[in-house]
Amino acid sequence: MFLLYEYDIFWAFLIISSLIPILAFLISGILAPISKGPEKLSSYESGIEPIGDAWLQFRIRYYMFALIFVVFDVETVFLYPWAMSFDVLGVSVFLEAFLFVLILIVGSVYAWRKGALEWS
């Protein structure tokens, strides 16, 4: 039988976790000093007066390396708990993890073949 009162802790956690950032933004908006002088509108570069524009364009290669790094970082986040409980989970989870790693390897080979991993 599906009982709705079993989810009271979930709803309380959801409401509290939603209220904390909302209250933080409201309180900081009320208490923060408002000043729009020239110092607020200039960019900050380690206490030195900025020379030239603060905007510069990064090459797309940087984003490709960052994206591949994030993919393998997420892979580590998923595979570490799996490795810690490998003996409990069984063979089916091993096959799923193997498929996950295989998809990542195929994606890495594809990125390598397309030249996304070359810096120059």
From Swiss-Prot:
Citing just one GO molecular function, the answer is: quinone binding
Q: Which family does it belong to?
A: Belongs to the complex I subunit 3 family.
Native species: Phaseolus vulgaris (Kidney bean)
**Membrane topology recorded in Swiss-Prot or TrEMBL:** Multi-pass membrane protein
The reply on keyword Cell membrane is no
Q: Which InterPro entries is this protein grouped with?
A: NAD(P)H_OxRDtase_bac/plastid (IPR023043), NADH_UbQ/plastoQ_OxRdtase_su3 (IPR000440), NDAH_ubi_oxred_su3_sf (IPR038430)
Q: Which domain of life is it from?
A: Eukaryota
What protein name does the entry list? NAD(P)H-quinone oxidoreductase subunit 3, chloroplastic
Presence of the UniProt keyword Phosphoprotein in the record: no
Q: What class of enzyme is it?
A: translocase
Question: What broad taxonomic lineage does this protein's source fall under?
Answer: Eukaryota, Viridiplantae, Streptophyta, Embryophyta, Tracheophyta
Q: Where in the cell is it found?
A: Plastid, Chloroplast thylakoid membrane
Catalytic reaction(s) noted:
a plastoquinone + NADH + (n+1) H(+)(in) = a plastoquinol + NAD(+) + n H(+)(out); a plastoquinone + NADPH + (n+1) H(+)(in) = a plastoquinol + NADP(+) + n H(+)(out)
Keywords on this record? Chloroplast, Membrane, NAD, NADP, Plastid, Plastoquinone, Quinone, Thylakoid, Translocase, Transmembrane, Transmembrane helix, Transport
According to the record's subunit comment, the protein's assembly and interactions are:
NDH is composed of at least 16 different subunits, 5 of which are encoded in the nucleus.
What function does this protein fulfil? NDH shuttles electrons from NAD(P)H:plastoquinone, via FMN and iron-sulfur (Fe-S) centers, to quinones in the photosynthetic chain and possibly in a chloroplast respiratory chain. The immediate electron acceptor for the enzyme in this species is believed to be plastoquinone. Couples the redox reaction to proton translocation, and thus conserves the redox energy in a proton gradient.
TM segment ranges: 9-29, 64-84, 88-108
Please give the GO cellular component terms listed in this UniProt entry: chloroplast thylakoid membrane; NADH dehydrogenase complex
Q: Which GO terms describe its biological process?
A: photosynthesis, light reaction
What's its EC? Answer: 7.1.1.-
Gene3D superfamilies cross-referenced by the UniProt entry? NADH:ubiquinone/plastoquinone oxidoreductase, chain 3
